[in-house]
UniProtKB/Swiss-Prot annotation:
It is found in: Cytoplasm. PROSITE patterns: FUMARATE_LYASES. SUPFAM superfamilies: L-aspartase-like (SSF48557). It is an enzyme of class 4 (lyase). Its EC number is 4.3.2.1. It catalyses: 2-(N(omega)-L-arginino)succinate = fumarate + L-arginine. This is Argininosuccinate lyase. Keywords: Amino-acid biosynthesis, Arginine biosynthesis, Cytoplasm, Lyase. It holds the Pfam family ASL_C2. GO terms for cellular component: cytosol. GO terms for molecular function: argininosuccinate lyase activity. It comes from the Bacteria. The lineage of its organism: Bacteria, Bacillati, Cyanobacteriota, Cyanophyceae, Oscillatoriophycideae. NCBIfam families: argH.
Amino acid sequence: MTKQKTWSDRFEGSLHPAIVEFNASIGFDIELIEYDLTGSIAHAQMLAHTGIISPEEAQKLTQGLEQIRQEYRQGEFKPGIDQEDVHFAVERRLTEIVGDVGKKLHTARSRNDQVGTDIRLYLRDQISQIRAQLREFQQVLVNHAENHIETLIPGYTHLQRAQPISLAHHLLAYFQMAQRDWERLGEIYARTNISPLGCGALAGTTFPIDRHYSAELLQFQGVYGNSLDGVSDRDFAIEFLNAASLIMVHLSRLSEEMILWSSHEFSFISLTDSCATGSSIMPQKKNPDVPELVRGKAGRVFGHLQGMLVLMKGLPLAYNKDLQEDKEAIFDGVKTVKVCLEAMTILLAEGIKFREERLAEAVSEDFSNATDVADYLAAKGIPFREAYNLVGKVVKTSSAAGKLLKDLSLEEWQALHPAFEADIYDAIAPKQVVAARNSYGGTGFEQIRQAITRAKAQLESS
């Protein structure tokens, strides 16, 4: 049996060893130790600032906490499950280092506001890192876009060829998704960057603390105005996991396209040896493991979001032990997004080569220029719906004859409608089809150049 003397001498009995292990979170919340130490240093300095402890005591506490930081970084501080959690582990080690003054650190503080502070410090840091990764990802997309403004690729709806577009246009669509992700995380950062320190267990404290002072030391932008809300709020974590899920949605969609494009059936890209694997039995295989793993890992992040929503939905105010379960969801969500962003950035930068000859063939061997025939007739005064129906018949007739639109003779065109002239061939040429779509945000080459300029400005603004 294990006696948990850290709580209070109210307990005479001891916890069953299995319950000790079940109750302990030190196995995963050790991830917060650097943030716990930083928060504790700020708390100690606030206690001295308000006269609750002496400056000398605060200095001893700060020195002891920094010693623990060094011990942890050097692999010397390895608390076991008997320590229950990172907060008790730090406090016990601190008391060993500085003596009884270490027991004063927890004055005017509860583990409830302490862990809330730690998680916010951690997530604030991780959000900044993920935003930086998104910028690297976006930069690679822009680099490819600059090189492929006039490289054409089939555009799809329903996974059926629809209209030819610029490859750069396709890549910049993912830039825009990542831009929304970057902006969304910035908004979540602001709501995460609020201090619960000083809220106590749930009702505040009788000590004359200065919550704004400790918040300023920790570079929080403000403090919670309600102590119950401060210790029980996990909205910011749910918002983060929602944003993380959207990042994974976007990466998974791109992954699916990389998988399709690398297949023999598409052959739009080839995978380099640095980002592909082989088969244990089929020597000809080159497998797109990176995008497949990213696509698969999206599910675990979605699961963490759902888990957090279910975790929070029935909790009465204020703190409940259920909230111990928030950390692994947050930690794994962070790590999964970061590793997937890194892998996809490497894949795009080093792992793929666009097969431009194959892409050129792909946009020339179908009827994806049919809309432009209808537009051609509409520009000559024929109602679009009438033109649309006529072109549908043209496609049906041409397909039955084994011909593409470009293969029809002028006589055949004019037999269909006298409005057709020799310039129809220019109008349906793939590059002209793409260049003509010059509306704002469209795939026209001039629009793409402007979009790249805007994208670069967004990258430089951060």
